[in-house]
């Protein structure tokens, strides 16, 4: 409704651009903006998580490319989105700690998506992302998957569960991080 009434055009024009950006790919069934909105419903009502979902794909319109068959790709959107989220959150006067955590989650929300992890990979990921952010990142990744098309959803969720299980085992073993 805020988009349709042009409210977001005033305070979050980046979102309007996302609403107008198609995702022509088997993994997606919505525009970027529609996917963002859908993803919000898959995280708890936590400020950091909701902001991370609002911004997790905000960089996609800036990096979109398309194959000759029309399939869209968004390489590097995590880093671009994190920089955009930082600017937006400064503009909207969010506190620095919230902005830093949200930007970290945005930057790394696709980290390890194609990797079948072992404990060493989990330790490396936690060291890169931060132990304070890792469990939140798993929630962001789950919401992202749930808001995508059904294509390979079960496989993606199984892989994510493995990341989570190995993380919990590493913490229990005192290996993190």
Residue ranges and their predicted role:
Residues 2-13:
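Proline-centered turn/helix-capping motifs that create local helix->coil transitions or kinks
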């Amino acid at each position: 409704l805020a988009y349709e009434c042009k409210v977001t055009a005033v305070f979050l024009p980046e979102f309007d651009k996302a609403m107008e950006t198609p995702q022509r790919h088997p993994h997606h069934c919505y525009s970027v903006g529609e996917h963002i909105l859908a993803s919000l419903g898959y995280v708890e009502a936590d400020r950091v998580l909701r902001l991370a979902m609002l911004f997790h794909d905000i960089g996609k319109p800036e990096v979109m490319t398309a194959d000759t068959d029309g399939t869209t790709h968004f390489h590097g959107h995590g880093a671009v989105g994190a920089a955009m989220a930082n600017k937006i959150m400064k503009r909207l006067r969010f506190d620095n700690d919230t902005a830093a955590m949200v930007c970290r989650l945005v930057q790394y929300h696709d980290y390890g998506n194609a990797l079948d992890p072992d404990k060493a990979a989990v330790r490396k990921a936690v060291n890169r992302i931060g132990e304070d952010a890792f469990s939140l990142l798993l929630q962001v990744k789950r919401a992202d998957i749930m808001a995508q098309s059904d294509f390979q959803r079960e496989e993606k969720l199984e892989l994510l569960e493995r990341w989570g299980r190995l993380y919990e085992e590493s913490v229990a073993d005192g290996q993190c991080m």
